[in-house]
Amino acid sequence: MKWKALAACTLAGLALIAAGCGGGDKAAAGGAKAGGQDLKGKKLVMYVSFHEDTAKELADLFKKQTGADVSFIRLPTGEALARITAEKDAPKADIWLGGTADAHAKAAADGLLEAYKSKNAKMIMPEYQDKDGFWYGTYLEVLAIGYNEKRFNEEFKPKGVAAPTTLQDLLKPEFKGEIIMPDPRKSGTGNTFISSVLQNMGEEKGWEYLKALKPQVAQFTPSGFTPGQKAGAGEYLITVNFISDQNLVSAKGQKLVSTIYDQAGWTVCPVGKIKNKANEDVAKAFIDFVLTKEAGDILVKTTNGIACNPEVAPPQGMKPLKELPLFKTYDLVKAGADKQKNCDTFFAE
């Protein structure tokens, strides 16, 4: 897989936000929509790097349409990539669903994914899919700062403390020990944060900021969703993770006040076919299925993410992409390439 080609796709995608891609073996031609296939008695195993309820709804609908027997294991992005790597010579799964684009790009570059040109690729904006079919974006994720509204109003507001809405706010002494974030070594969300800060601020100022932030953080979690859950429960005041995860917590009654901070990092959650000959026809059919509007509606409903299929309506209350204060030149390729180096530096002290 050619990293420069993926970088070109990333920049093209960001042009659309304001108003990656790879080489390798030729992809197989795409098949029909999943709903038109009879796959009864055939099996599909997935590694899923997003919410279990989302995966279950997708799996149930795919099974209803095709008769295929679907099972999945939920793993954070970093753990999923490590597992797929370890199983390279004897793969145990057919599909990797979710995670981050930089991780899928790394998997493709390492020969862990198989390119597949889905017939339904045209349903996904070209800016959010690999041009050779190694992965397809399903929905967009954006980083945000969230805080527990109840705790803030009771414990911090009476003291005259301003609500945290910017990256610099996280460095205030009042918030030391009250911040929870995902671990960039295991979580794609965490890697998106570290990498976007470094790319936006530059190496010198970026590391200066991150080294000041680290002692402020009380806990780093393997999962990108957990920080929002724990902040929502009041165990910590502040979370930094994807706004869709924060919205899911708030929707369950644990109110988080969320702000997409200026120059926020972002990613797409892809689907890719793991190199595994065992269940090829079912795996390809699932990719065809998950790119459809019907699957996209499930993704938006259960994740609050912004679908990469333009026929799918955005989440209620979400601003259009062009109005979000994103870090528009964020390089997904660099995020994947620099992950190990950045994590080693961040946790060196």
Language model features: what each stretch is:
Residues 1-43:
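Short, low-complexity disordered leader/linker segments with a strong preference
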Residues 22, 32-106:
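Early extracytoplasmic/lumenal segment of secretory-pathway proteins
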Residues 45-56, 91-235:
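Extracytoplasmic ligand-binding site segments that recognize negatively charged/polar headgroups
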Residues 102-106, 232, 236-255:
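A ligand-binding cleft/hinge motif common to bilobed small-molecule-binding domains
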Residues 141, 175-182, 209-214, 220-221, 253-277, 289-313:
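Periplasmic-binding protein-like
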Residues 146-151, 268-280, 298-299:
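A bilobed periplasmic-binding-protein/Venus flytrap-type ligand-binding module shared by bacterial periplasmic
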Residues 203-205, 305-349:
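An extracytoplasmic/periplasmic, membrane-proximal ligand-sensing/linker region
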